[in-house]
Amino acid sequence: EEADALTGTSIRSSPISGNIMAAAPNLRIVAKASIGVDDVDVEAATKQGVLVTNSPLESNWSAVAEGTMSMILSLLKKTRERDEAMKRGEWRDPVLQGTFLGNRQDGYKGLTIGMIGFGRTARRFTDLLAPWRVRIIAYDPYIEPSRFVLSNVTRVDLTTLLKESDIVSLHVTLTKETRQMIGVEEIGLMKQTAILINTSRGQVVNEKALIDALQN
């Protein structure tokens, strides 16, 4: 009741609801030490005159881009499987050969990587991909076209991205628009061999649709 400010890195287990803010009459600000504010009732905060802030620092979005790169390399190179096989003494097993997608000619040059969302994280991820000489496409209706041009990325619609990408990487915040944006229809458009990387919020992807696709 006496709080003037609330802060936290991840408060999804105890979201800041309108009722919580109403119980703190002196509350002036809810400050997130991370990028997402999906665990704060922003609409209620606006009505109550409470400022909501986030921290879009490089240490946040750059680390996510690096984590995305790490996941892709781990999957393509079968890092976990190789580690486990080495410990079992089966390091010569032919099934441990790397996974190569697209027309393999020079490294991963034949790969098409599609990014849904082209904000700071995705653009940093694009920088990390530069030495790979892969084809990069992206979908983001809110980013000006010049951003894509400056990053040497081809801007496409969502359907095209899903159909053409060998790797689909999600880089969006969780909003009403993006919640469950990857569902049965979207997964059905993807290649059978495609890899889906989600370093956004889990609720961006329809979990049941994803499980069904993997099992069938």
Label every PLM stretch briefly.
Residues E1-L6, R133-R135, S146:
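N-terminal glycine-/charge-rich "phosphate-binding" loop or analogous flexible N-terminal tail
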Residues S17-M21, I137, P141-N216:
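Rossmann-like adenosine-cofactor binding region
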Residues A122-R123:
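N-terminal Rossmann-fold NAD(P) dinucleotide-binding loop
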Residues L27, K109-T112, V184, T193:
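Phosphate-coordination loops involved in phosphoryl transfer and adenosine-cofactor binding
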Residues T126, A130, L214:
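Gly/Ala-rich phosphate-binding loop of Rossmann-like dinucleotide-binding domains
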Residues P56-T112, D127:
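Phosphate-binding beta-alpha-beta segment of Rossmann-like dinucleotide-binding domains, i.e.
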Residues E1-L57, K163, G183:
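An N-terminal-biased, well-structured beta-alpha scaffold segment characteristic
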Residues F118-G119:
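Glycine-rich Rossmann-fold phosphate-binding loop(s) that bind the pyrophosphate
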